[in-house]
Amino acid sequence: MKFKALASLILLSLAGINLSARDSQFTRHGTGPKYWIAYEWCWVNNKAIPEYQWRKNIDWVAENLKDYGYDMICNDGWIEAAQTINANGYITKYNSDWQNGFEYWNKYISDKGMKVGVYYNPMWMTRAAYFANCPVAGTDGITTMKIAGNVNFNSELYWVDVTKEGAEQWIKGYVRYFKNLGVSYLRIDFLENYERNYGTPAYEQALKWIAEEAGDDMFLSLVMPNCYNHGLTELKYGDMIRVSDDCFDGGWDFASARRRGEHKSYWPQYGNAFDGMIAFSDLSAKGQMILDGDFMRLNTMANKEERRFLYSLMVMGGSALAVADQYNTVGDALEVYQNTEMIELNNQGFVGKPLSQKLGTWDSSRWVGQLPDGDYVVGLFNREENAATLEIDFFKDLGIESGVATNVRDLWNHKDLGKMNEKYSAQLEPHTCVVIRIHPKGKTRFQAEFASVKNGATTSTSNGN
């Protein structure tokens, strides 16, 4: 029976939990943050978001999403034009054309009762900092030119070479600089580029320094990682890793279709969010790695059902719930972001698992997990182009010994479906899903939350990552 394999997998994983995972208040919570990010405007216009749009979106989030738990604002890429620096070479603004810098905007966000996230890589050095030959804070006479590497990220951003004296002080100093500005979330991008050009040992050394300085106060989001050896390096130093390609234009392509079923050994290993969440699901659990399915642009989905599908995937996988829709693009998608019953799962640190990690199987579209009070949450997804019936067996799949649910609740329709025996079944149209909460009768086969299977038993399927 399927449950026997699942139960064995979970029990063994509890005994063999990966002790090398980064231990922080964030990984202990289990799920990613809920926040707004400036990605959509930047992607659509292929340039940095202007200050007036930034302000309007902050105000919109404060009025429409903050009360639902989306309590953080984060800038995004297109960062090359951030060339305004302080005496030690650290950037003081998201963009040099902006009137105001980090101090002003961090206070503006904080005054609205929200936290601040920053998109930046501490291994970067701006062109301005290089040619100013700034003194590296914490060193005796070492300057920026002396720690720059031989390979640049691009014409405006250089890489720091970790083998050079002063590199540690630069990288740790950048993290400390952002922490002192009140930043609680650091989104570190283009990691594959550094590892590719400087090698895995140098890459790991840089991440180690970042994690040491971040401590338990700053959330570390690792973006565009190669995740060689199934994230062995990233697991030790990050709170959250990206598991699939960028959102880009969004839509069903991003959610489920792009390069479906295909795998690469380097970034991006998977082309769509669903495949990535399946493939790395064995790493995720409280005290382990948080999976990042990237940003949601729900306004790009075809209809309400597709919006619910993508949001449900992020919730079931324990991902960050990162809103990229804006005040003038979100439209009817706002109601999806405001589903308090789904949000509560994220609040409780809920992380679900697919019943199989084998891409393309129906079991990989059936996700299950357990809440601290013993209730089960089940997500059934139809990724296909034809209608399908999906079901969950209370005993075989969940281990409910009585085979009885005293109540099943539909979390999207906010409706109690009542008592059910043996199983729950749903007829799902293409690109739709259902998420239910099951209150079992009597004892279940296990009471522990679903744990990571990294370094424990493995699923019957390997996708090669």
Which residues fall in each region the model found?
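Mature N-terminal, pre-catalytic/accessory segment of carbohydrate-active enzymes
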Residues: 20-35, 39, 44, 441-448
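Extracytoplasmic, non-cytosolic globular domains
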Residues: 182-186, 190-218, 222-225
